[in-house]
């Protein structure tokens, strides 16, 4: 025994030493542990990855949220002697799902899980949330604990897209319903802003698992950080509370301790809530029949009756009142004057005019024959009434009338005297229980008893209060008609009726005794007597004078009978030949060559400018950030552009002519195209149907790779004009797509980029759009294109934008040349002399300057038979005496159109008097000093013939002085208020005679200043000035 006691300390020391030598192992999950399986599902699709620059910044915030959440997964001890422990894992997804790390025990695997999350590279493609949720469920069920009540998913997403493509794993609702069926709770956490709340609400198990949870926000504000921290704390607390109810239920608690001492009696409880409604009672006795119901509703409209007979024509209506004066409309913009049309054919003979008014009254005719005897005259009118006859005797009294109706009931009588007092009644029944009294004051607290054990799970609570009344339901249908009621009680007597009609007149009574009254007044005249016999006819009177002419009678009936055609007369003899008439005036010359070419251009349809043949390619961004609705609008835009080119620009999309194709793209190796070269497409109609059938891809954005695909597949070498129209949001994933965006740029291709805001309302990236459209490249590297930016996709379908796009596509039209070219065969110095007087006006002077610039451009760009022949132009403004601009010192002939146009634009309107003679002398001196002898000298003068103090003789002298200097004068006249004699002298230099042929080639007339800029007038003037 003593030996055993001595050996015991040695054995204990050996065991302790052996235990210290064993390697340390991770703590195993004890029986009393309560494990929780938590799995993160992270969205790294395009709508998240490419929303912020630099691309992937929002994904980094999602990863930061996940790592912060993992740091908050700490064990907890419950009072039921159980420990909450965590198992966590994560995956990320786009249109594919990748497991970051499976379920790992915390805290031992915390660092490894955080490192794996930090190493995630975003996919940046489509969004298959249903597949990701089902993959997360698989990880929870296969690798998790045995408690299915403690399994949670945290889905971090922006909810995009809302619609547009079929999710391949059964859809989002199917995945969420599967999670509910398996008992897995799903939290939905938003990536704000621009998240789709409806989709997030579908993902969450119920509204308590959604709330306003946020994983990442754009701003770095304090509020945003607090919202993210609050999201993590709220989710962790909800899980801990739920787990406590699961792991600390009554079945899982350890053995209970001994019962405690009986406590003091509690205070009287408050009055309980009303009990539940009792069972429905038996049906009561039937009530008495109701009163007669109200009049029923109007019945349904009957069928349409047969058509009635035609009514008689109504009377002619009165003339209506004069209407009120309407509101003055807005003045419309005056349109441009149209080109004069060709003379029309001779019209058909007109209809007969309206019959003229009746002529004046004719002279009275001769007396007619004696008339026949007239008929007897009409009866005469009644005579005056005769005197009144004597009054009649008094009649006998009449018989009594029938008895009257029963009178109304009388008023109630006064109350009678009080009766004798009755006997004392017996005791009444017991009354209802009174209301309880007010609660007494609270007593002093007793001594605190020992702390009791945790109570059991309480019973099921009483039902809650009934909810608020629902909304009023729709009006019910009309019920069946009730049975007729019983006959009512007799009503009170009605009011007295009106007095009856007077009775019949009684028979005449006997004559009474003679009266003794005074004689009455004479009676009224009696009624007229009968008509007397006709008297003897008088002697016949003399005939009266003829009456005035009566009014014209109504026109007789039309005579529709065709009169027989008369016999054709014999042909007459030919008359003698008349003398020869004098020669007519010389007619105006016919239209010149420029006007003839203009008429041909207007009349001939084959003269229209033709667009094409062209090779037209559309490249459509079909990524997730575009959205389904915007992609559908882009397809409609393509179809409308093709229709407009076919209809308005007469482009023929058929083999051997023009070609069209469409490419839609998303991420890497995800491109699709349809074109007229496809084997299944035979014509442009089938091409449009194929475009409408394209399905939205909803993936990432690899624009460079798509443009390379377009160049390789759809842009072979071709002699046609090649145009590529790229529609995108300008946010290509250039970090992973290394293909340059200017891959389409080449001298033979024109690229137009259209940037439009995406579903997140982000402004398109102008830097990428400029690169796509070949901006800033040398001509040898590529043809500069065009970059356009729009607010939204709906603007693509606006009429103005469609016109601009078709105009840009057909910018290189092939048009016939009807410009009426001019050629100079010798050197020429031309001066354009503008009228700057007050009668012209500032606005008209600006129009004249624009016309002068057109003429100058035609002169300076005209062809020359010899390149050594110089054509020089000067523009001068004149007004009163000594008022010519520019001054002589600065006036010179110019050959550079840009310099000349700048000088014309800088001219200020003088706005003073008019002195044509002084202006002619100024120009004549200028030609003598600045013009060479070999050059043709031409002067184009603007004038209305009115000049200050000028006479025909003075004008003739100034013009002849210019002609002696070799100057040929051409005159432009605007308007109708002109001095015609002075104009003729300015053109010919002669006051005696006027050469019409010479005048027609040197005088130009227009009705207004606006007409200077219409049509080909500037071509006509410049051609005649050049030919001389």
Curated annotation (Swiss-Prot):
Changing residue 571 to T: In BTHLM1A; uncertain significance. Changing residue 290 to R: In BTHLM1A and UCMD1A. Residues 550-560 have a biased composition (Acidic residues). Residues 257-592 are annotated as: Triple-helical region. It is found in: Secreted, Extracellular space, Extracellular matrix. Residues 384-394, 457-471, 483-493 have a biased composition (Low complexity). It comes from the Eukaryota. One of its GO terms (cellular component) is collagen type VI trimer. Glycans are attached at residues 212, 516, 537, 804, 896. Prolines at the third position of the tripeptide repeating unit (G-X-Y) are hydroxylated in some or all of the chains. Residues 593-1028 are annotated as: C-terminal globular domain. Changing residue 43 to A: Found in a patient with limb-girdle muscular dystrophy; uncertain significance. The keyword Chaperone does not apply. Gene3D superfamilies: von Willebrand factor, type A domain. Trimers composed of three different chains: alpha-1(VI), alpha-2(VI), and alpha-3(VI) or alpha-5(VI) or alpha-6(VI). Collagen VI acts as a cell-binding protein. This is Collagen alpha-1(VI) chain. It comes from Homo sapiens (Human). The gene is COL6A1.
